[in-house]
């Protein structure tokens, strides 16, 4: 029985330590001011360099100037395009506010103190993105807005050189963060034209600032035919450049709840690359050479995703793009849990209630394991007098003691691990729930009731963590404790306090789950102990 309780304590401490360690990496508030000061102090230059074509060693030089900007706006997305090169230099997510209760949209792509842009163009023999500079596209007007009743908007930008007409078209769709970026090359000459498409994302090579609501991790990722999903951090980029030839795939720049990604033609052979240069990290792709015969034309397609980690829409955009919602090793549990969470939310229309609903469902499913755990622990308690007698009888003869204990367990039909296995089974589920709540952009700025207006942020008044600690204390008092070792007793007594401190700065959605879980456990434990009392396996007297 002592070993069961010790295992429970060690397991909870281990899970808490792992979660708290990860949280410190993602949410460390102490470095926020320092990192933000670094970002503000360094003004990154807007780099216009593009990748070299296949079998070329040159790198395109930076442009000293920019063209004018053009704004494209749908119901959920506003893009700012630089006509010099046709790069996306800003993206505003109109359905996501920058801060709670703010009317300012969240800005994903941006320029200024830091660079975070999505570039694309054409290199190669007749490419217009060269060492001489970037193309200055012409566009009909400065602002384009998706009209009411219109589901799609196409905005062409044109550039003509040496008898070849290049048209770069952006296609925005209603309710979508998936933007089609297509090149049409119309060869009006008597010579063959060869171009090679590319798309890349550039980001100022600085550690991201941490906060309580936004984690510090920002880095690259890619997908290839061989690897469904692979993170490639800025540190990885500084150590070695990516150079992967693959069919299909994509490249991306990840933040906590948001992602920008280039998705090339999935039927073509592409090269995925990365590099760092002048304080800028770049991850991108280069497509195959496209040959356009005289007096003919060709269209090269690609997609740009710049928006929240919407799993359903990302999955429809490109294979494995939804894996940027990173559940870690517990993904096979977290995915169905997230599906359950969204299903319940569609009924109750409140994410806090959905968390409570998921907790109830999970605890109900696990109830047989919980009952088996408490029953096994109760049977072990009943054997404690006999076990103590054996210890006194056999003393230091551990082999004989072990043999007699195994014999006793067999006669009494008690599994000494019966109280441990249910605990071990439930731990991965808790970890999966943790990542589900931490990765769900749906919880960002999602209100519950009263003072909880953002389930992704800490409780501003620490009420939920304190209630959670109180529920742990009550649960501990309800549980029979045969522990006699003073050190173990102190650890057990200190656990509710320690957990309360851990959870003071955790997202309120996660604390709400733990509090609900404790309350359900208290009810289940009361029911189980009442049943055990009837069987003579439990007594309320301690």
Curated annotation (Swiss-Prot):
TM regions (residue ranges): 7-27, 338-358, 417-437, 455-475, 494-514
Gene Ontology BP term (one): protein transport
GO CC terms, sorted: plasma membrane
Record gene name: yidC
Sorted UniProt keywords: Cell inner membrane, Cell membrane, Chaperone, Membrane, Protein transport, Transmembrane, Transmembrane helix, Transport
Protein name from the UniProt record: Membrane protein insertase YidC
Subunit organization: Interacts with the Sec translocase complex via SecD. Specifically interacts with transmembrane segments of nascent integral membrane proteins during membrane integration.
Compartments, record wording: Cell inner membrane
Organism: Actinobacillus pleuropneumoniae serotype 3 (strain JL03)
Gene Ontology molecular-function annotations: membrane insertase activity
Keyword match Endoplasmic reticulum: no
Biological role: Required for the insertion and/or proper folding and/or complex formation of integral membrane proteins into the membrane. Involved in integration of membrane proteins that insert both dependently and independently of the Sec translocase complex, as well as at least some lipoproteins. Aids folding of multispanning membrane proteins.
CDD domains: 5TM_YidC_Alb3, EcYidC-like_peri
Family matches, as Pfam families: 60KD_IMP, YidC_periplas
Membrane-related topology note: Multi-pass membrane protein
Stated family: Belongs to the OXA1/ALB3/YidC family. Type 1 subfamily.
């Amino acid at each position: 029985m002592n070993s069961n309780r010790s295992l429970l304590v060690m397991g909870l401490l281990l899970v808490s330590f792992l979660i708290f360690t990860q949280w410190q990496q993602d949410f460390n508030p102490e470095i926020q001011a320092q990192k933000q000061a670094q970002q503000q102090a360094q003004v990154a230059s807007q780099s216009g360099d593009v990748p070299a074509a296949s079998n070329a060693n040159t790198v395109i030089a930076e442009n000293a100037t920019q063209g004018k900007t053009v704004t494209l706006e749908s119901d959920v997305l506003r893009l700012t395009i630089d006509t010099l090169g046709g790069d996306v230099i800003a993206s505003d997510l109109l359905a996501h506010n920058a801060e709670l209760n703010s009317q300012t949209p969240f800005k994903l792509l941006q320029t200024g103190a830091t660079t975070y842009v999505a570039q694309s163009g054409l290199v190669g023999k007749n490419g217009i993105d060269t060492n001489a500079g970037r193309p200055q596209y012409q566009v009909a007007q400065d602002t384009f807005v998706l009209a009411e009743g219109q589901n799609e908007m196409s905005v062409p930008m044109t550039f003509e050189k040496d008898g070849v007409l290049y048209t770069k078209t952006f296609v925005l769709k209603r309710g979508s963060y998936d933007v089609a970026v297509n090149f049409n090359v119309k060869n009006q000459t008597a010579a063959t034209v060869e171009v090679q498409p590319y798309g890349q994302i550039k980001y100022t090579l600085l550690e991201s600032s941490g906060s309580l609501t936004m984690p510090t991790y920002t880095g690259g990722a890619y997908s290839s035919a061989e690897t469904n999903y692979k993170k490639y951090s800025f540190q990885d980029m500084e150590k070695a450049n990516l150079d992967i030839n693959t069919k299909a795939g994509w490249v991306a720049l990840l933040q906590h709840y948001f992602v920008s990604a280039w998705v090339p033609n999935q039927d073509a052979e592409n090269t995925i690359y990365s590099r760092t240069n002048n304080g800028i990290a770049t991850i991108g792709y280069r497509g195959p050479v496209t040959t356009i015969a005289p007096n003919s034309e060709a269209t090269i397609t690609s997609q740009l995703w710049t928006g929240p980690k919407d799993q359903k829409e990302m999955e429809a955009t490109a294979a494995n793009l939804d894996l940027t919602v990173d559940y870690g090793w517990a993904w096979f549990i977290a995915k169905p849990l997230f599906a359950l969470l969204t299903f319940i939310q569609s009924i109750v229309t409140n994410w806090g209630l959905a968390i409570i609903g998921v907790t109830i469902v999970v605890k109900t499913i696990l109830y047989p394991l919980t009952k088996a755990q408490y029953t096994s622990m109760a049977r072990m308690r009943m054997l404690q007098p006999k076990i103590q007698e054996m210890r006194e009888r056999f003393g230091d003869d551990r082999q004989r003691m072990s043999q007699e204990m195994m014999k006793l367990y067999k006669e009494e039909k008690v599994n000494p691990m019966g109280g441990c296995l249910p605990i071990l089974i439930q731990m991965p589920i808790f970890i999966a729930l943790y990542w589900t709540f931490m990765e769900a952009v749906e919880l960002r700025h999602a209100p519950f009731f009263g003072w909880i207006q953002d389930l992704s942020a800490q409780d501003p008044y620490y009420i939920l963590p304190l209630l959670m600690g109180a529920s742990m204390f009550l649960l501990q008092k309800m549980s029979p404790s045969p522990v006699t070792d003073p050190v173990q007793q102190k650890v057990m007594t200190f656990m509710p306090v320690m957990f309360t401190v851990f959870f003071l700065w955790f997202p309120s959605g996660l604390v709400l789950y733990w509090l609900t879980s404790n309350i359900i456990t208290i009810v289940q434990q009361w029911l189980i102990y009442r049943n055990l009392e009837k069987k003579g396996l439990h007594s309320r007297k301690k």
